[in-house]
Amino acid sequence: MKKIAEAWPIVKGDYTVGNPESRIAVVTLASQINSLPEAALWGSSKTENLGVEKIIINTISNSNIRYILICGKESRGHLAGHSLLAIHANGIDEKGRIVGSEGAIPFIENISREAVKRFQQQVVLLDRIGLTNLEEIMKIVREYKDQGEVYPEEPLVAISQKKRQSTFTIPHSGDIIVSEEFVMDSAAGVVCTTNDF
């Protein structure tokens, strides 16, 4: 069975890659704490939306990761750590809102409910929000780095290719004549051919 997706970690972020075979990843929230090579991934997360999405995507694409240590200082207002705990415990509603999150903008837009469910099943979160002592963090990482079995399913690559809808519209009238062939809608700042009308 394949344990790690190709090109893992899938999404870029503020993290360091350690041992991809490790059972633990470390999220230091808004704190910058020196990384240990024994963790699969080690990095910060300051937002309750994109930050949480990146953690989920990079976790479920490596079946070796079974634990996530959440430590460091919480980001003010965004509450990324609280939101990570909430999505793991409660998931997301039909609008993509993290159920139970008190973060400022706790909406997940780029991953599916299936990806969230896989995250909930694959990992155990170790809530040590506020812990910044590197020695204590090292003890936890070393305790969990080899603990447990690989998740019994292949890695799940969960990146949506959401396409943004274009906001460009052709004006229905031009208020500035540029030439016989072109007019401009000064309110929209759009130049069009006269054939478009």
From Swiss-Prot:
EC number: 2.1.1.-
Statement: the UniProt record of this protein carries the keyword Methyltransferase: yes
Pfam families per record: MtrA
Enzyme class: transferase
Alphabetically ordered keywords of this record: Methyltransferase, Transferase
InterPro entries: MeTrfase_MtrA/MtxA
Domain of life: Archaea
Example GO biological process: methylation
Molecular function (Gene Ontology), one example: methyltransferase activity
Subunit note: May be part of a complex composed of 3 subunits; MtxA, MtxH and MtxX.
Family label: Belongs to the MtrA family.
Protein name in UniProt: Putative methyltransferase Mtx subunit A
Annotated source species: Methanosarcina barkeri (strain Fusaro / DSM 804)
Phylogenetic classification of the source organism: Archaea, Methanobacteriati, Methanobacteriota, Stenosarchaea group, Methanomicrobia
Gene (UniProt): mtxA
